[in-house]
From Swiss-Prot:
This is SPARC-like protein 1. It is found in: Secreted, Extracellular space, Extracellular matrix. It comes from the Eukaryota. Keywords: Calcium, Disulfide bond, Extracellular matrix, Glycoprotein, Metal-binding, Phosphoprotein, Secreted, Signal. Residues 131-144, 233-258 have a biased composition (Polar residues). Glycans are attached at residues 144, 368, 446.
Amino acid sequence: MKAVLLLLYALGIAAAVPTTFLSDHSNPTSATLPTLEDATVPTVPAEAAADIEKHPNHKAEKPSALNSEEEAHEQSTEQDKTYSFEVDLKDEEDGDGDLSVDPTERTLDLQEGTSEPQQKRLPENADFPATVSTPFVDSDQPANITKGEESQEQPVSDSHQQQDESGKQTQDSMTEESHKQDPGIPNEEKEEEEDPEDVGAPSDNQEEEKEPPEEQPTSKWEGNGDQSEDILQESSQPTQISKTKNDFEQGSQGQEGDSNAEGEDKAAGSKEHLPHTEWQGQEGRAGLDAIGNRKDTDEEKAVSTEPTDAAVVPRNHGASDNGGGDDSKHGASDDYFIPSQEFLEAERMHSLSYYLKYGEETPDESENRSEAGDNQGAKKAESSPNAEPSDEGNSRGHSADSCMNFQCKRGHTCKTDQHGKPHCVCQDPETCPPAKILDQACGTDNQTYASSCHLFATKCMLEGTKKGHQLQLDYFGACKSIPACTDFEVAQFPLRMRDWLKNILMQLYEPNPKHGGYLNEKQRSKVKKIYLDEKRLLAGDHPIELLLRDFKKNYHMYVYPVHWQFNELDQHPADRILTHSELAPLRASLVPMEHCITRFFEECDPNKDKHITLKEWGHCFGIKEEDIDENLLF
């Protein structure tokens, strides 16, 4: 059934072709016929012979051309009757006939198009009418252009008759070749193998193109309009896609060579019946297939990227202009440059490089953009939680600046309140720096602390209690088991203490790199007198009786060492008063020698006010009150 419908459709189109070609000259005269024989007979057989040598499947083309010449005049007289019959068949077979014939049309169309690899540019002032509005019109366009170059000054009627014969020859050959094609080719491949040259192209003779439709009958005008719409629906999409791609690459020059480059590539694709993916690989257009709304975007881009030349009209105006009819279906090669084989190869490689550069990188760019968006979102998400820590860091920095010059007692630390004012609070023992074994300290409660920092921090936390008030640093190091100090030992303690202080000053005065610069000039002058005195008792483990006798004999040698020791302890603060904390260094150094030091300092504070003045200090060491002088504190 399909074969019968295809045959009827082909016969209907063959009958309608002369009507279309003879739109301007419905009644041929004797003047035009001789010109037709002289102008077209030598050209058509030569081109057909060249095509037959290159393409063996055109064997039936030559006898078809002879038969078409004999039937030319007979069909012209019956144009009105046969055209109405063709319109009816066209309406019935509109859905199936177009797609079934297209592969054969494209094969012959592209094979003949490649038989002439090099053509010259058609002059813009050449007066050629529009070609026939059938799907087979592009198969003879290269021949028509070649003929136009050889005889540009021929009358318009000659080119009409020439196109009439070539159109009929193509129709007969198409009818025979349609039965030889493989019917199993998918419709999708057929649509994609449509030649983009079928779409409407620019024309320099727009005024002449509008005249033939006015002379045709109304029924013929409508039939050709329907035929134009069917062809444009099938073939406009590939042309617009390729045009849009090349507009980004080459501008107006890319528009001139685009349709010819695609025709060269699609000819090889239609001969070998390549799959859809291979055709995309040859054309380098696979990047646009991923676009879902490519029809709308391609039409918009095709209109927006038109050249500004006044002599060139939009390439898709045939699809939008229903009044164009026959004239709107010129091949793209009517007014455009036909490039050479080398130019086509360069265009194809450029298109492939464009696809590899932009078509394949588009997904990567989208992924990179999405990844960049995700990274920005993650950074924002990370920055929001970090805002509060940064504020805390600023507050800490501000508090550090406020507490830099604010001093607190030992065991206390500085902290700012809500208004930024610094104040002292008890230090947490856990915040003390790590301590070594040598940093251990023994308190007056006979408890060993990791360091003095831990001891005073504990004392601060016990403030307000009796234990906290009594807790003091007893000496450095772990607490020892010290026997109780007797009254006799307490009485002997000042004697040993005076001798010990005198011996320390002698060591500091002697030339020693370790003690260099420890004593100032005034101190050295005082120590020098003691050091050079021959009656001085040298250091050693002397009995109490010897120590008591030397003190009475050389009293003046012990006055300055007692003042010097008080000045050394009175540092925090230097107020001429010794606190229990200021006595701690002396206590720690004396404990290994004397276990009565705690009781000794208790005896030195007769008023029990926890403070030892210079006079109280002198009295403990047996210095006379008149010899106690603050001027010796230097």
